[in-house]
Amino acid sequence: MKKTISSVVVALLVNGAAIAQIASPDESEAIKKTALDYIEGWYAGDAARMERALHPELAKRMISTDPKTGRSQFNHMGAMALVQRTRDGSGKKTSPDRQSKEVTILDRYNNAAVVKIVASDWIDYLEVAKFNGDWKIINVLWELKPKPSE
Protein backbone atom coordinates (compact mmCIF):
# COMPACT_ATOMS: atom_id res chain seq x y z
CA MET A 1 0.00 0.00 0.00
CA LYS A 2 2.85 2.39 0.90
CA LYS A 3 4.47 1.63 -2.44
CA THR A 4 1.26 2.51 -4.30
CA ILE A 5 0.83 5.78 -2.40
CA SER A 6 4.48 6.66 -3.00
CA SER A 7 4.09 5.95 -6.71
CA VAL A 8 0.98 8.14 -6.90
CA VAL A 9 2.72 10.99 -5.05
CA VAL A 10 5.76 10.78 -7.36
CA ALA A 11 3.50 10.73 -10.44
CA LEU A 12 1.62 13.80 -9.18
CA LEU A 13 4.85 15.66 -8.47
CA VAL A 14 6.27 14.87 -11.91
CA ASN A 15 2.99 15.86 -13.57
CA GLY A 16 2.88 19.06 -11.50
CA ALA A 17 6.42 19.95 -12.54
CA ALA A 18 5.51 19.45 -16.20
CA ILE A 19 2.41 21.63 -15.82
CA ALA A 20 4.50 24.32 -14.08
CA GLN A 21 6.91 24.33 -17.02
CA ILE A 22 4.08 24.62 -19.50
CA ALA A 23 2.41 27.44 -17.60
CA SER A 24 5.51 29.45 -16.61
CA PRO A 25 4.53 33.12 -17.10
CA ASP A 26 8.15 34.28 -17.56
CA GLU A 27 8.75 31.81 -20.39
CA SER A 28 5.38 32.62 -21.96
CA GLU A 29 6.27 36.32 -21.99
CA ALA A 30 9.67 35.56 -23.54
CA ILE A 31 8.03 33.42 -26.24
CA LYS A 32 5.46 36.14 -26.94
CA LYS A 33 8.24 38.76 -27.14
CA THR A 34 10.01 36.65 -29.78
CA ALA A 35 6.78 36.36 -31.79
CA LEU A 36 6.20 40.12 -31.51
CA ASP A 37 9.79 40.86 -32.58
CA TYR A 38 8.99 38.82 -35.69
CA ILE A 39 5.63 40.34 -36.65
CA GLU A 40 6.20 43.90 -35.42
CA GLY A 41 9.69 43.87 -36.93
CA TRP A 42 8.11 42.84 -40.25
CA TYR A 43 5.53 45.62 -40.21
CA ALA A 44 8.09 48.25 -39.12
CA GLY A 45 10.81 47.19 -41.55
CA ASP A 46 13.09 46.62 -38.55
CA ALA A 47 15.58 44.03 -39.81
CA ALA A 48 17.51 43.93 -36.51
CA ARG A 49 14.35 43.06 -34.60
CA MET A 50 13.42 40.38 -37.15
CA GLU A 51 16.90 38.89 -37.06
CA ARG A 52 16.84 38.80 -33.24
CA ALA A 53 13.70 36.61 -33.39
CA LEU A 54 15.04 34.07 -35.89
CA HIS A 55 17.41 31.13 -35.64
CA PRO A 56 19.89 31.44 -38.55
CA GLU A 57 18.70 28.07 -39.92
CA LEU A 58 15.03 29.15 -40.01
CA ALA A 59 12.82 27.67 -42.70
CA LYS A 60 9.70 29.64 -43.62
CA ARG A 61 7.39 27.59 -45.82
CA MET A 62 4.05 27.91 -47.55
CA ILE A 63 2.01 25.61 -49.75
CA SER A 64 0.12 27.60 -52.37
CA THR A 65 -1.91 26.76 -55.44
CA ASP A 66 -0.66 27.64 -58.89
CA PRO A 67 -3.52 29.68 -60.39
CA LYS A 68 -2.80 28.36 -63.91
CA THR A 69 -2.54 24.64 -63.16
CA GLY A 70 -4.42 24.32 -59.86
CA ARG A 71 -1.52 22.22 -58.53
CA SER A 72 0.12 22.71 -55.16
CA GLN A 73 3.49 24.40 -55.06
CA PHE A 74 6.05 24.57 -52.27
CA ASN A 75 7.50 27.99 -51.38
CA HIS A 76 10.51 28.32 -49.08
CA MET A 77 12.46 31.20 -47.56
CA GLY A 78 15.44 31.14 -45.21
CA ALA A 79 16.30 33.47 -42.34
CA MET A 80 18.53 35.86 -44.26
CA ALA A 81 16.03 36.23 -47.12
CA LEU A 82 13.32 37.09 -44.58
CA VAL A 83 15.60 39.60 -42.85
CA GLN A 84 16.42 41.18 -46.23
CA ARG A 85 12.73 41.42 -47.23
CA THR A 86 12.09 43.05 -43.84
CA ARG A 87 14.95 45.51 -44.44
CA ASP A 88 13.53 46.27 -47.90
CA GLY A 89 10.27 47.35 -46.24
CA SER A 90 7.92 44.69 -47.63
CA GLY A 91 5.95 44.70 -44.36
CA LYS A 92 5.55 48.48 -44.42
CA LYS A 93 3.15 48.09 -47.34
CA THR A 94 0.47 47.05 -44.83
CA SER A 95 -1.16 50.21 -43.50
CA PRO A 96 -0.93 50.66 -39.70
CA ASP A 97 -4.70 50.31 -39.25
CA ARG A 98 -4.52 46.81 -40.82
CA GLN A 99 -1.44 45.58 -38.95
CA SER A 100 -3.05 42.74 -37.03
CA LYS A 101 -0.69 40.82 -34.74
CA GLU A 102 -2.74 38.47 -32.58
CA VAL A 103 -0.27 36.11 -30.84
CA THR A 104 -1.40 32.84 -29.22
CA ILE A 105 0.89 30.24 -27.66
CA LEU A 106 -0.77 26.99 -28.72
CA ASP A 107 1.53 24.63 -26.82
CA ARG A 108 4.76 24.62 -24.87
CA TYR A 109 6.86 21.92 -23.30
CA ASN A 110 10.31 22.52 -21.87
CA ASN A 111 12.33 24.21 -24.61
CA ALA A 112 9.84 23.97 -27.49
CA ALA A 113 6.66 25.88 -28.29
CA VAL A 114 4.15 26.37 -31.09
CA VAL A 115 2.78 29.88 -31.60
CA LYS A 116 0.03 31.13 -33.90
CA ILE A 117 0.06 34.67 -35.26
CA VAL A 118 -3.01 36.06 -36.97
CA ALA A 119 -1.65 38.84 -39.15
CA SER A 120 -3.38 41.18 -41.58
CA ASP A 121 -3.57 38.90 -44.62
CA TRP A 122 -2.06 35.63 -43.41
CA ILE A 123 -1.69 33.15 -40.55
CA ASP A 124 1.76 32.09 -39.27
CA TYR A 125 2.42 28.95 -37.25
CA LEU A 126 5.79 29.36 -35.54
CA GLU A 127 7.88 26.55 -34.09
CA VAL A 128 9.97 28.20 -31.41
CA ALA A 129 12.85 26.71 -29.41
CA LYS A 130 15.03 27.89 -26.56
CA PHE A 131 18.51 28.17 -28.05
CA ASN A 132 21.45 29.29 -25.88
CA GLY A 133 19.00 30.76 -23.39
CA ASP A 134 16.89 32.72 -25.90
CA TRP A 135 13.66 31.78 -27.65
CA LYS A 136 14.23 31.63 -31.43
CA ILE A 137 11.89 30.89 -34.30
CA ILE A 138 13.09 27.70 -35.99
CA ASN A 139 10.27 27.07 -38.50
CA VAL A 140 7.31 29.00 -39.87
CA LEU A 141 4.43 27.45 -41.80
CA TRP A 142 2.13 30.11 -43.15
CA GLU A 143 -0.89 30.56 -45.34
CA LEU A 144 -2.63 33.52 -46.90
CA LYS A 145 -6.14 34.31 -45.73
CA PRO A 146 -8.79 34.08 -48.45
CA LYS A 147 -9.52 37.43 -50.06
CA PRO A 148 -12.97 38.78 -49.23
CA SER A 149 -15.52 38.33 -51.99
CA GLU A 150 -16.26 41.51 -53.85
Report the location of each language-model feature.
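Short, low-complexity N-terminal intrinsically disordered segments enriched in polar/charged residues
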Residues: A18-A48, R52, P56
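Bacterial N-terminal signal peptides
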Residues: S7-G16
